[in-house]
Amino acid sequence: MSVEARAPVNQSVERAARLLALFSVEEPELTLAEVTTRLGTSKATAHRYATALRRAGLLRATPSGYTLGPRIVELAATALAGLRIVQVAGPHMERLVAAVNETVVLSVWDGEAPVVVRVDDNTNRLVRINVRTGSRLPLDSAQGKIFRAFALGEEGLDGVRRSGLAFNARIVEGIAALAAPVFQGDELVAAMALVGTTAAIPDDVRSELARALHETAAVLSAELGFLRPEERRTA
């Protein structure tokens, strides 16, 4: 038995971790009663843990209960920055920003939704698009469509699979995103997107922006060891 396996479990730490894990994309806010029931403790105990986590910035109190706090976002961003895909993608994203003069965003799948792991801002435009690292994106975002098409194999997204591009301009008014898949081996590992105003990002897979994005994602995928189906057959 390893030393780690024999180590005693700190019940307070374990319970605090379980409390934080109760929150999800589907349930970003929970009442104290819901926390109490799911944690399997008394209301007083649940309140004590929630109060301690709130003071640490890991929970935020709302009029009806709690949501995850701002410190969670900071910790998530720190963890995500250590991912290999973030480090390898950096130079490619910087070159793409310089080429197209738009903000470039990299997202990975956390099991439920796309999560932003790196943002390279366009600093030359009058209007800058601020995308926060650690943000979870909707499933109908451009990045969400990429994961739904290539990782989840959803029906109704054949156009995305054929073109290798997904567009959305309905998440935030006036803002559009165009995304492409990034593969490692034969698996989807990330979605790379151009984000800008609807005037700057066209819904056109044949545009210069679309071509530049698609080529950058393909070069990054090749660096990560992606082989096209025809290359796998001859390898």
Task: Describe the role of every protein-language-model region.
Residues 176-182:
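A short, aliphatic-rich beta-strand micro-motif
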Residues 65-154:
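Amphipathic alpha-helical effector-binding/dimerization core
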Residues 103-105, 135-136, 166-167, 177, ...:
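Histidine-centered metal-chelating micro-motifs
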Residues 183-188:
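Flexible loop/coil segments at beta-strand boundaries within sensory signal-transduction domains
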Residues 1-79, 219-226:
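N-terminal helix-turn-helix
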Residues 156-157, 163, 167, 173-175, ...:
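Juxtadomain coupling helices with adjacent low-complexity linkers
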Residues 9-13, 69, 82, 86, ...:
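Short, structured helix-loop boundary elements
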Residues 22, 38, 87-99, 103-105, ...:
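Amphipathic alpha-helical regulatory segments at dimerization interfaces
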